[in-house]
Amino acid sequence: MYLGEKAGKFFPQKSPERERVLEWLFWQVGGLGPMAGQVSHFVNYAPNFPGDHSYSEERYKNEYDRLLGVMDRILNEREYLAGDYSIADMASFPWVTAYKRYEVNLDLFANVRRWFDAIKSRPAVRKGIDVGKAARNFGEGISKESLKTMFKQDAKSIAEMAKKKEKE
C-alpha cells in the first residue's frame, strides 16, 4: 500500500476503485497467502519430517483450490481482481505461480489462467521472476540443522538460542 500511494500507481486514490483494491489486497493477505503458504509447507517441507501429513496436505490443497475458484468467478467479470491492474494483483500473483508444485490444474480455472498469463507476460514481472529463480529451492537440499531452525522452534528453544548467542 505504501509504495502504491507513494508512487501514485496501481492503487486508486478514489472510491469505489480504492475499496475494491483494498478488498482484494486483504483477501490475499487473509486467505490466498496463508493457505498457499500452508500448502507449500506440507508439499515442500513436511516430507522431511516423520509421520503422515496427507490429511494436512489434502486439506490445504483443497482450500487453495477453493480460493482459486473465488478468483475465477470474479475474473469472469473483470480483467484483473479489482478491475484495472493493481497492487491486489501484484500481491496475489506470486501465490498462484506455484500451482504446478501444488499439483493444481490451472486450466480448470480459465479466468485465473488468463489473468495469470497476462500478468506473467508483463516485462517488469518477467524481470522479477528471473531475478528470483536462483533463490527458489522449495526445501531441496536443506540441512537438518536448517530444518530444525525453521520448524522446531518454540519459546524455550528461542530463549536457549539467545543465551547461546550472548555467550559467543
Would you name each region that the model predicts?
Residues G31, M35-S40, Y80-L108, R113-I119:
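GST superfamily/GST-like fold recognition
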Residues M71, D89, I119-V125:
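Residue-level signal for nonpolar/aromatic packing positions in well-ordered secondary structure
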Residues M1-E58, N62, D72, I158-E168:
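GST-like domain detector, emphasizing the conserved glutathione-binding G-site
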Residues Y60-L67, W115:
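Alpha-helical packing segments of well-folded alpha/beta enzyme cores
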Residues K6-F10, W24, E77-R78, T97-E103:
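Alpha-helix C-capping/helix-to-loop hinge sites
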Residues G132-E168:
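Acidic/histidine-enriched, glycine/proline-rich intrinsically disordered or flexible terminal extensions
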Residues K9, R73-D84, P123-G128:
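Surface-exposed helix-capping loop/turn segments at secondary-structure junctions
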